[in-house]
């Protein structure tokens, strides 16, 4: 089964994808990790690379290309990334939401930065990504119609989210 998991920064996609990968015993691929790897390749931090990518369509197209290439010919895979649902043929497409303050707190704990710094970075990064996605792909990141399931990750613990998704995969398997 191919599953895509997307969500804004700090919404819990990486945590849930890793737990689900272990639970289902299937590999996990992160578009965010591809983006971070490309930033390192260019010698930039995430915010710098995001701004650079905003003026360079080739960056987004390369991320999409790398993701599609790595996902190609897989029978079972979890693909985590904001646009994964648009570029990966999947049996289940999931989007995570969470309040800005919750996402800010999660990133603060993960990266050890101040709340104000993280909140500004989330807002800046979100605007940058929304602009790039609209300009390059014509995708409105706020449009949930492409997703089969939208989960408020603030409402559940990560293990509970993985269990919800697992149950949905069981339902899908029964319908095939």
Name the predicted role of every residue range:
Residues 22-29:
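Post-Walker A helix-loop "phosphate-sensing" segment adjacent to the P-loop in P-loop NTPases
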Residues 11:
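ATP-binding Walker
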Residues 8:
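P-loop (Walker A) phosphate-binding loop of NTP-binding proteins
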Residues 31-87, 100-101, 112-117, 127:
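ATP-dependent small-molecule kinase phosphotransfer cores
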Residues 5:
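Hydrophobic anchor at the beta1->P-loop junction of P-loop NTPases
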Residues 115-164:
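Small-molecule kinase domains that catalyze NTP-dependent phosphoryl transfer to phosphate-bearing small molecules
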Residues 14:
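Walker A/P-loop
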